[in-house]
């Protein structure tokens, strides 16, 4: 037994030793990979990358930057790469002692150092590339500025006439660029690449702005010397022609405004010669705005004349229509008021319209006289005609409404008479149905309702014979009688249906009298109520009795009555 225990312990020990050696083997692989990475990092061309700057002019800012980066290289190597070998050796020694955790810590530290080394290397690559690219950009801008400088100089020399008095200031500005180009060369030769970049970039912007000025100046000069003076002349002679045609353009003040604009225009060329183009553009914009205002006023007058010619015919027709309609209304009112009641306000409105129409005709005659003058301000004429058109339109609408009212009086009277005849006919028809029904007698309330309708009809007929008729009152009374008639008919129909239904229920219930005492008793009561014209109560008692012996039968009987 002891032997087995000893053997088991030995097996466990052997397994533990095997595991330890296996773990050490894995860690040794990690150390080998760390060693391989160190070798790869040592191959990074840190110094070779920095040597790219030696092709530049190593002075000034470039030299300072180069020295700083070279110093950083040394510090990076000493601080991050040199300790890596020591970390790897420490890890190997700890691994031999089976101190796996401590060995792993050394390996991790080694990787962190190499990560930082690689990061510094990439940062240096970026810095070197930025410096080289900035030098290239500086050279490209410099070459562009030189080309632009020569072209601008030739352009002013060859096309001096296009620039007018601005040619000399342009030449002076262009000549100022030569020392600035030389200044760039000095900064470059001194190795101050950042200052050189700022200088050449600013110079490129200045040249670009001056080139845009050179493109703009000929256009401004042409507008100042030719286009605007030509527009002044065209506007002046155009207004003279329009005045000959009969336009009153005194309110436009063409001559005075043009003279004022000429004075303003005289300040523009000196501004251009001083290269004050923003101020020159503002001045020209102001001149053009004032020209547009005058053109708008003149165009408004021309359009106003056309509208006046179109509106005159319309207003003439509208005034004639208003006058004719007013005469017709006065005649109709005198005729109609013999038969119908007319509000005095309507008659007064017609007389007021007559005065207004006459006043509008007088105003219209004055306007026509105004248009026959040698000089006419058509915008004012148009405003006056618009007022006339609006006013006469209102009068025509009101007079049309009044005429429709007079026509409606006759139609309303005829409609009221027709409705009254229908009421009389319908009343007699309903009463005949009541008399011919199975009712023991016509209920008293229907006799009362019939008499009330007869009385109302007689009163209305009396009013129809009176003159003048108050149509609205008649129409309202007839409408009230129609409502009474509808109520009379609806209630009569209800009574007739209830009477038939009650009779059917009693007749059907007779079959149960012998065998069901309570049915016989209830039907006797229903018959009594029927004779007293209390049909609804008779129905309730008969329904209750029949439902007690034959459920659902009353519904069936009711449906049959409705169908009949």
From Swiss-Prot:
GO cellular component: plasma membrane; septin ring
Its membrane topology: Single-pass membrane protein
GO biological process entries: division septum assembly; septin ring assembly
Cytoplasmic side: 24-564
Domain of life: Bacteria
Listed transmembrane segments: 5-23
Keyword list, A-Z: Cell cycle, Cell division, Cell membrane, Coiled coil, Membrane, Septation, Transmembrane, Transmembrane helix
Protein task: Negative regulator of FtsZ ring formation; modulates the frequency and position of FtsZ ring formation. Inhibits FtsZ ring formation at polar sites. Interacts either with FtsZ or with one of its binding partners to promote depolymerization.
UniProt protein name: Septation ring formation regulator EzrA
Statement: the UniProt record of this protein carries the keyword Aminoacyl-tRNA synthetase: no
Compartment list: Cell membrane
UniProt topological domain (Extracellular) ranges: 1-4
Coiled-coil spans in chain: 84-126, 165-223, 271-303, 350-435
Similarity comment: family membership: Belongs to the EzrA family.
Pfam families, per database record: EzrA
């Amino acid at each position: 037994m002891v032997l087995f225990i000893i053997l088991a312990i030995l097996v466990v020990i052997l397994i533990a030793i095997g595991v330890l050696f296996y773990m050490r083997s894995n860690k040794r692989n990690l150390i080998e990979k760390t060693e391989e990475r160190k070798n790869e990092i040592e191959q990074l061309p840190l110094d070779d990358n920095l040597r790219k700057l030696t092709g530049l002019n190593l002075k000034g800012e470039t030299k300072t930057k180069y020295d700083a980066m070279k110093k950083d290289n040394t510090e990076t190597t000493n601080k991050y790469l040199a300790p890596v070998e020591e970390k790897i050796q420490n890890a190997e020694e700890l691994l031999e002692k089976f101190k796996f955790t401590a060995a792993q810590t050394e390996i991790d530290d080694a990787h962190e150092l190499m990560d930082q080394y690689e990061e510094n290397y990439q940062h240096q690559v970026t810095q070197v590339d930025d410096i080289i690219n900035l030098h290239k950009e500086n050279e490209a801008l410099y070459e562009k500025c030189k080309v632009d400088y020569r072209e601008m100089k030739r352009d002013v020399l060859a096309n001096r006439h296009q620039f007018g008095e601005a040619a000399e200031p342009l030449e002076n500005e262009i000549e100022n660029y030569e020392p600035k180009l030389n200044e760039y060369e000095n900064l470059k030769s001194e190795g101050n690449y950042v200052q050189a970049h700022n200088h050449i970039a600013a110079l490129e912007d200045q040249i670009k702005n001056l080139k845009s000025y050179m493109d703009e100046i000929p256009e401004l000069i042409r507008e100042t010397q030719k286009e605007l003076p030509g527009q002044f002349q065209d506007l002046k002679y155009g207004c003279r022609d329009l005045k000959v045609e009969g336009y009153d353009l005194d309110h436009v003040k063409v001559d005075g405004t043009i003279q004022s604009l000429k004075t303003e225009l005289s300040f523009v060329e000196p501004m251009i010669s001083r290269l004050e183009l923003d101020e020159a553009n503002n001045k020209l914009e102001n001149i053009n705005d004032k020209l547009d205002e005058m053109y708008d006023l003149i165009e408004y007058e021309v359009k106003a004349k056309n509208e006046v010619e179109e509106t005159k015919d319309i207003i003439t027709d509208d005034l004639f229509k208003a006058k004719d309609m007013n005469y017709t209304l006065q005649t109709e009112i005198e005729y109609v008021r013999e038969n119908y009641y007319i509000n005095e306000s309507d008659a007064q409105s017609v007389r007021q319209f007559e005065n207004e129409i006459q006043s509008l005709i007088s105003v219209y005659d004055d306007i026509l006289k105004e248009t026959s003058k040698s000089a006419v301000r058509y915008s004012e004429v148009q405003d006056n005609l618009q007022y006339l058109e609006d006013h006469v339109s209102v009068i025509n609408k009101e007079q049309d409404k009044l005429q429709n009212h007079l026509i409606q009086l006759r139609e309303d009277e005829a409609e009221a008479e027709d409705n009254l005849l229908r009421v009389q006919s319908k009343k007699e028809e309903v009463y005949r149905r009541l008399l011919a029904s199975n009712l023991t007698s016509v209920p008293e309330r229907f006799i009362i309702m019939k008499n009330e309708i007869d009385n109302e009809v007689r009163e209305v007929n009396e009013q129809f014979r009176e003159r003048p008729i108050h149509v609205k009152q008649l129409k309202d009374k007839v409408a009230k009688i129609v409502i009474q008639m509808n109520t009379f008919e609806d209630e009569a129909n209800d009574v007739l249906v209830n009477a038939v239904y009650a009779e059917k229920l009693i007749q059907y219930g007779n079959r149960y009298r012998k065998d069901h005492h309570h049915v016989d008793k209830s039907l006797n009561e229903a018959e009594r109520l029927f004779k007293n014209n209390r049909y609804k109560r008779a129905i309730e008692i008969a329904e209750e009795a029949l439902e007690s012996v034959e459920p659902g039968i009353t519904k069936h009987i009711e449906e049959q009555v409705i169908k009949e």
